[in-house]
Amino acid sequence: MKEYLDLLNLILKNGYPKIDRTKTGTLSMFGYQIRINLNEGFPLLTTKYCHFKSIVYELLWFLRGDTNISFLKKNNISIWNKWADKNGNLGPIYGKQWRAWEDKKNNTIDQIEIALNKLKKEPSSRRILVSSWNVGELDLMSIPPCHVLFQLYVINNKLSCQVYQRSCDIFLGLPFNIGSYALLTHIFANQCDLLVEDLIWTGGDIHLYKNHLNQAKLQLTRSPLPLPKIFIKKKPKNLFNYAFNDFLLIDYNHHPKIKAPISI
């Protein structure tokens, strides 16, 4: 994806040195937008290997409303291990907020179900939003949400999604986040018999950790390859019944993996 490489190059050249919570140090910039036409292929980075299995299982985990890593560990996904407590709990992170946001009357609100119903019954609505940024529960989370909000938009029977990410690790996180929200858009479209259109990613504090500089420079020496395609094999009776094997990634050709440490 040239759009991603352009942002990576921009932050290498113009990013401001900034001390961060992890004490690793970053090059940082504020505010940027990428628009990806999902009809041109599934936006999984080709200039390094991205683990599609982790993207799928994490998204299915979110959609289950789960906040314990046991489901991920059962499927050999370790991406959340370092943030979990000794019992595997992460507090009321994404899954809890998406599926069971608590109101002041102690009722729970299923934002995903509401969004799905609006897409089916009122696709022109400007209120098809899902938020993870529950101010009243931030201090109970192992880490506050990085991608905090997404909005769905339908025109001419085509579905677009815009996501706002307050904090973005551009080297390790962003390729994963783009893949995840692209897949989520395809899932909503599949459930609602819509076509897909655009994924719009909007970033707040976008940062390249200083222990990722050499990896970023290596990646910029590589030329993007044609994007893969995504095929959803069936339409389950509801959005929460998808399984990993329902998704087929076709023709994912990529450059070799580039290892980089995670800052916690």
Swiss-Prot record:
EC numbers on record: 2.1.1.45
Keyword annotations of the record: Cytoplasm, Methyltransferase, Nucleotide biosynthesis, Transferase
Pathway: Pyrimidine metabolism; dTTP biosynthesis
Chain sites annotated for binding dUMP: 21, 126-127, 166-169, 177, 207-209
Catalysed reactions, as listed in the record: dUMP + (6R)-5,10-methylene-5,6,7,8-tetrahydrofolate = 7,8-dihydrofolate + dTMP
Localization annotation: Cytoplasm
Gene Ontology biological process: dTMP biosynthetic process; dTTP biosynthetic process; methylation
Active-site residues from the entry: 146 (nucleophile)
Residues engaged in binding (6R)-5,10-methylene-5,6,7,8-tetrahydrofolate: 51, 169, 263
SUPFAM superfamilies, sorted: Thymidylate synthase/dCMP hydroxymethylase
GO cellular component terms, semicolon-separated: cytosol
Cysteine pairings via disulfide bonds: none
Pfam families in UniProt: Thymidylat_synt
Function: Catalyzes the reductive methylation of 2'-deoxyuridine-5'-monophosphate (dUMP) to 2'-deoxythymidine-5'-monophosphate (dTMP) while utilizing 5,10-methylenetetrahydrofolate (mTHF) as the methyl donor and reductant in the reaction, yielding dihydrofolate (DHF) as a by-product. This enzymatic reaction provides an intracellular de novo source of dTMP, an essential precursor for DNA biosynthesis.
Family: Belongs to the thymidylate synthase family. Bacterial-type ThyA subfamily.
Subunit structure, as described in the record: Homodimer.
HAMAP family: Thymidy_synth_bact
Name of the protein: Thymidylate synthase
Species annotation: Wigglesworthia glossinidia brevipalpis
Gene name, Swiss-Prot/TrEMBL: thyA
